């Protein structure tokens, strides 16, 4: 029984299957963890979603910002951009069932036995484990409720930048969503910067990658995340693992065999501009 953790797939189905073949993944005994953003940009988002859904209990995934964007398109709250390569997915005969399945997925995975946490973007530095769990559950309730379109319509904003336990309503949900699915940089006071995506060496001195700020999270827990392909899996402290290595941009898809702490790489078959 092994736990395999893979970064953002972004519709790169062939690379996903090739990577799983390298480790002889067996859904009857192994567990596949996915950091979110299963879809968009790559050419085979529909196949990725169908495969992920078929894994049943062998899959532990989290939702990413692109997954939430897809739900918003399907709910009629945003427009489909053909460049995202989602048109065939949205026209699929089983799209409603796939979207119902997708909205049931969590934003946070915690395994207390493995001392392992996964989110798409990371863990906000001012949250401990209990706070992160509570906040993620608030978004999950909103996604599964009958006000889904309204939540999705209001969730994709840059503000508020600062966290307070006293945040309420839309502002609270917006901050939590951003922290779990879009966060990269913070200022020293913990407020979010939602504009910069480049590597730390190229940003202003008063910005810090979220994982370099002092954290309230219990130190025995490892954090795995995706979202930030520019890092190329590098520059994180011990026990923090960046797994998005930009397969959809022509780079590679990365798998981490958790028990062995061993990486496996599958180069992209095509670069994004060729899809």
UniProtKB/Swiss-Prot annotation:
Keywords: Hydrolase. One of its GO terms (molecular function) is bis(5'-nucleosyl)-tetraphosphatase (symmetrical) activity. Signal peptide: none annotated. This is Bis(5'-nucleosyl)-tetraphosphatase, symmetrical. Belongs to the Ap4A hydrolase family. Its EC number is 3.6.1.41. Hydrolyzes diadenosine 5',5'''-P1,P4-tetraphosphate to yield ADP. The keyword Hydrolase applies. InterPro entries: ApaH, Calcineurin-like_PHP_ApaH, Metallo-depent_PP-like. Pfam families: Metallophos (PF00149). SUPFAM superfamilies: Metallo-dependent phosphatases. It catalyses: P(1),P(4)-bis(5'-adenosyl) tetraphosphate + H2O = 2 ADP + 2 H(+). Gene3D superfamilies: 3.60.21.10. PANTHER family: CYTOCHROME C5, PTHR40942.
